[in-house]
């Protein structure tokens, strides 16, 4: 007598499916839990870095990257922390990882350009900034145009720098950093009137930023406007008593009063 194998086969397949489904579900749940933990670690790392604990924040971000190795945002955040630590090669490495995962990532491209800018590699910096600026999906191209202007300014190509700064301002009239860069450009050219006007615009949009007040104070000193310069220096000391600009302002004020 021959027995049919069909019922046994059906039972085996059914049993296998019953076992396999929980395993696959478990893997999916574990993966989701890992991604969630990675996100928590990344947020903690960014917060620590923002508060000044840069190395501690970096460790959290590296842990996050291990848990979620396909997350381009975590790689970019890690790259930014390496940049702040002055480790430019590792910063570039992590920006490249982010861009491998997401080639059209203009924020990362622009930020990678800032690393080249800090390294003095103007050509690669400009290449990154131009690519980011021309990406139609980039929501803040004014950052890339400002950075490109700064790179050209560093290269001594004043006209190209001016064009990019002006483009950045057309995109965002309240972008204080551009006014600051324009002020420095005009000051270097010896056009103190335009420099002063742009310093005032920078201060208008970022009144608490000591950089604008310091630039203005130094320009006023050059022009012999010492009383106005003193007002700017006192403002810096009040707003940034322990910072670099605050300490420099004290020295300049003491020199003016002696």
Model-inferred region functions:
Residues 35, 214-258:
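Terminal, low-structured helical/coil segments at or just beyond the last alpha-helical repeat
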Residues 50-51, 84-85, 118-119, 135, ...:
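Register position in tetratricopeptide repeats
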Residues 33, 67, 101, 135-137, ...:
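Structural marker of alpha-solenoid helical repeat scaffolds
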Residues 43, 77-80, 111, 147, ...:
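Canonical tetratricopeptide repeat
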């Amino acid at each position: 007598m021959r027995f049919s194998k069909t019922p046994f086969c059906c039972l085996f397949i059914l049993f296998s499916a019953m076992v396999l489904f929980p395993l696959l579900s478990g893997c999916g749940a574990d993966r989701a839990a890992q991604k969630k933990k990675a996100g928590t670690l990344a947020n903690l790392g960014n917060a620590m870095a923002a508060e000044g604990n840069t190395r501690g924040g970096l460790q959290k971000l590296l842990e996050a990257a291990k848990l979620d190795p396909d997350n381009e945002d975590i790689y970019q955040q890690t790259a930014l922390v390496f940049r702040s630590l002055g480790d430019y090669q590792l910063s570039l490495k992590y920006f490249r990882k982010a861009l491998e995962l997401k080639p059209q990532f203009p924020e990362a491209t622009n930020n990678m350009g800032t690393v080249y800018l800090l390294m003095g590699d103007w050509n690669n910096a400009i290449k990154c900034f131009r690519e980011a600026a021309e990406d139609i999906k980039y929501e803040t191209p004014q950052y890339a145009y400002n950075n490109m202007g700064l790179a050209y300014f560093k290269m001594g190509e004043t006209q190209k720098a001016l064009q990019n700064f002006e483009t950045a301002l057309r995109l965002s009239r309240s972008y204080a950093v551009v006014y600051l860069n324009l002020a420095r450009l005009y000051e270097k050219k010896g056009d103190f009137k335009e420099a002063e006007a742009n310093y005032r615009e920078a201060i208008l949009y970022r009144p608490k930023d000591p950089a604008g007040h310091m630039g203005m104070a130094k320009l006023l000193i050059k022009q012999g406007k010492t009383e106005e310069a003193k007002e700017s220096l006192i403002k810096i000391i009040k707003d940034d008593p322990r910072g670099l600009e605050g300490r420099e302002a004290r020295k300049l004020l003491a020199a003016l009063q002696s």
